[in-house]
Swiss-Prot record:
Keywords noted in UniProt: Developmental protein, Gastrulation, Glycoprotein, Heparan sulfate, Membrane, Proteoglycan, Signal, Transmembrane, Transmembrane helix, Wnt signaling pathway
Source species of the chain: Xenopus laevis (African clawed frog)
Membrane topology of this protein: Single-pass type I membrane protein
Glycan attachment sites: 36, 65, 67
Record's protein name: Syndecan 4-A
Keyword Calcium included in the entry's annotation: no
Presence of keyword Signal: yes
Length: 193
């Protein structure tokens, strides 16, 4: 095989991979999305200036900045305002009957109860369809199909490159005659002796 054929095959593999990548991404749909706060150009025109003011400025409003540091008139007639009395709940702590357990059963002070008593039957928990966030993060890296496909594709491309490199070296050495076994020295003929 010629090196150009190997290069063409490698180029076809790379092109096929890039075509697959562009099939998954639709560039026209990406242009439809606008970022948060962006408006089309037709909504706001900076050239138009409203000539008529719909609001009036009071002189009282100019005195106050809203920061609370300006001087303003305080009415001294605070007594006229009705003050609402707050209802206090008090600081009484309800006394609990310590002879009763959580179940409401009364226990005698001399009674020793070694029996574990449950007020209701245990509930049978049905498995939920909800996926907890902890279980989604525990998915292994190699369990994702995209990762496995990428590893297989990378391995195949690497294998093709390695095979083409070896074939290229064999062809080149064969052309130079390096692969033919040549003796290190020539035997002299016995007639000369």
């Amino acid at each position: 095989m010629s090196p150009t054929l190997m290069f063409v095959l490698l180029l076809c593999g790379v092109a096929a991979e890039s075509i697959r990548e562009t099939e998954t991404m639709d560039p026209t749909s990406m242009l439809e999305y606008e970022s948060s706060g962006s408006f089309p150009d037709e909504v706001f025109d900076d050239d138009e200036i409203d000539e008529d003011d719909d609001y009036a400025i009071d002189e009282d409003d100019e005195d106050y900045s809203g920061s609370g540091t300006d001087k303003f008139d305080i009415d001294d007639n605070d007594e006229d305002e009705e003050e609402e009395e707050t209802a206090t709940l008090g600081n009484q702590i309800p006394e609990l009957d310590f002879d009763q357990t959580k179940t409401g059963r009364k226990i005698e002070t001399n009674e020793i109860d070694n029996e574990i008593w449950s007020p209701t039957k245990p509930k049978i928990l049905e498995p939920s369809n909800e996926i907890s966030m902890a279980s989604t993060g525990s998915e292994g890296f190699f369990q994702r199909t995209e990762v496995i496909v990428a590893i297989v594709a990378g391995t195949l491309v690497g294998l093709v490159v390695a095979i083409s490199f070896i074939v290229f070296l064999v062809i080149r050495r064969n052309q130079n005659g390096d692969l033919v076994k040549k003796p290190i020295y020539k035997k002299t003929s016995t007639m000369e002796v």
